[in-house]
């Protein structure tokens, strides 16, 4: 895993909100083992009850990352994409991990109530294709192509404020 110089703070403007985001880590992922190591490292940075929005193009490794993270928490079974079921919950010794995929939804806000109920008491929430501000996410994981590899960035997301305030 390599380090790359990136801005440590970034302002994100989406859907009328402006939020301060702080970069917690940036890693180059060249091998599957790099993704597994990233999941274990990210787990150490996330507080209990964290909600992580995961962004990246199709095939970027979002579900693979979630699988490694859930297994690092002690879930022994298979982790699959909830593309059609929308939400999967995995029991772990540290509490349930909720994994959602909003890719197919035209209006993700319709699922927010169900997602909120599933997240109650959860160790961790992981949402693929989720807007951090719409979800109220505490963190954002971005996976992006970088040549033959991928770049993973974990951002801590601050509260959103209306633009112009």
Feature roles, as predicted:
Residues 62:
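Conserved lysine of the Walker
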Residues 23-25, 71, 108-111, 116-165:
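Short phosphate-coordinating micro-motif centered on Lys-Gly-acidic
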Residues 57:
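P-loop (Walker A) phosphate-binding loop of NTP-binding proteins
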Residues 52-54:
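Hydrophobic anchor at the beta1->P-loop junction of P-loop NTPases
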Residues 21-41:
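N-terminal pre-Walker A segment at the start of P-loop NTPase domains
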Residues 1-4, 20:
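Short, positively charged low-complexity motifs
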Residues 75-90:
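Short beta-strand-centered segment that lines the nucleotide-binding/catalytic pocket of NTP-utilizing
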